[in-house]
Design a protein with these regions (language model features):
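Lipid interaction determinants
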Residues: 2-5, 10, 18-135
Length: 135
């Protein structure tokens, strides 16, 4: 009887581990098709904060401080490269334009990424920290 209980306990542990494995992996895998919001305060006079969304095929939508553009991302285990399309002309104040240019340059220089729960960090010349949108 004790051996039967022990076997059932082992079986229960194995089933639980099997079911929990994919959930844990998805918690640490790249969050494709999810909006990633830059972990910074909005600029004075605005509520807008930059957001990037990368589809599983690598298509990227990049919303900067003022302008928006598209691009292509290549993601593999812990490496990432982002190539952004040209930003269409927009009417922005000089401070927002400068911040757009700086952020876009930082995005195109990222080389690695890592995820810890709801936080995704892009690492390169400048570390960029994003939070998963949970709305």
């Amino acid at each position: 009887m004790a051996k039967l209980r022990q076997r059932l306990a082992c079986l229960l542990c194995a089933v639980t581990a099997t079911l929990a494995g994919p959930a844990l992996a998805s918690e640490q895998g790249f969050p494709f098709a999810r909006e990633l919001m830059l972990d910074v305060a909005p600029m004075r006079g605005s509520k807008r904060v930059p957001i990037i969304e990368i589809a599983e095929n690598g298509a990227a939508v990049i919303q900067l401080w003022c302008a928006s553009t598209r691009g292509q991302a290549s993601i593999d285990q812990d490496s990432i490269t982002i190539v952004a399309d040209q930003v269409p002309p927009t009417q922005c104040d000089p401070e927002r334009q400068t911040r757009d240019d700086s952020l876009l340059a930082a995005l195109t220089q990222v080389t690695n990424w890592r995820r810890q729960g709801e936080v995704v960090e892009f690492q390169g010349a400048t570390k960029l920290r994003f939070r998963l949108m949970t709305n």
